[in-house]
Design a protein with these regions (language model features):
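General detector of N-terminal leader/presequence modules that precede the first folded domain
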Residues: 1-97
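Generic alpha-helix signal with a bias toward terminal, lower-confidence helices
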Residues: 17, 22-25, 29-32, 108, ...
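Alpha-helical context
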Residues: 20, 68, 105-107, 166
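Short, Lys/Arg-enriched charge-dense amphipathic segments
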Residues: 49-60, 126-129, 187-192
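N-terminal, charge-rich interaction modules
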Residues: 71-125, 133
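Short, charged surface segments at domain edges that flank catalytic/cofactor-binding sites
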Residues: 123-151
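Cys/His-clustered metal-coordination modules, chiefly Zn-binding fingers
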Residues: 141-192
């Protein structure tokens, strides 16, 4: 069967199964465990638009009866996960044409299951992000902001949960139309 799970959907499934794992560990009532499993199943299926019967069967978590089955399920599910398409150096230069002295990262990435391509330009201390939104490659240049150590953050793009070293707060660089206006937005994103 063809890959049908986006990387961010896979991360969401992992988060749902983490909650189910906590239920297995902290609860002894089988009725509560079954209800938690049904809620997790509903959450997983609701993050997909259209699924065939075969895809629904692959996403079925009814056979998970212990926390050990969760890791096996996720390993089996990982073969159906896909990421963004390959990006060329010319595409990056075109997207970030306003960036001076742009340093392109190594595009021979081992993990092809990326949600976005991002790298930190050490000279300017900027995070440069390329994301495929509905078939169009978008680029964004962001300021890195210090965040509290040992805090858990959730990546906006891929739903990965990590500490401040893995998921950082960034603010896109915005140029206002009027000099008196100031606008700053921010969000959490994976740094690796």
């Amino acid at each position: 069967m063809k890959s049908f799970i986006k990387k961010q959907q896979f991360n969401y499934i992992k988060r749902c199964l983490f909650d189910l794992n906590n239920t297995f560990i902290n609860c002894s009532d089988p009725n509560i465990i079954n209800v938690s499993k049904l809620i997790a199943q509903d959450k997983i299926l609701s993050c997909f638009d259209k699924l065939s019967e075969g895809e629904k069967e692959i996403l079925n978590i009814s056979k998970i009866t212990t926390p050990l089955h969760i890791d096996i399920y996720l390993n089996d599910l990982n073969i159906y996960v896909f990421g963004m398409e390959n990006i060329t150096k010319n595409q990056l230069v075109k997207i970030f044409k306003k960036e001076k002295k742009l340093k392109i990262p190594n595009l021979d990435i081992k993990d092809k299951k990326l949600v976005y391509l991002g790298w930190i330009d050490e000279a300017t201390k900027k995070l440069l992000i390329t994301y495929n939104l509905n078939g169009n490659l978008l680029g964004m240049s962001c300021r890195l902001t210090e965040s509290k150590p040992n805090s858990s953050n959730i990546c906006t793009l891929c739903n990965h949960i990590g500490n401040s070293a893995e998921v950082g707060f960034v603010s896109p660089i915005c140029k206002p139309k009027n000099q008196d206006d100031y606008k700053s937005l921010g969000f959490y994103i994976c740094l690796n």
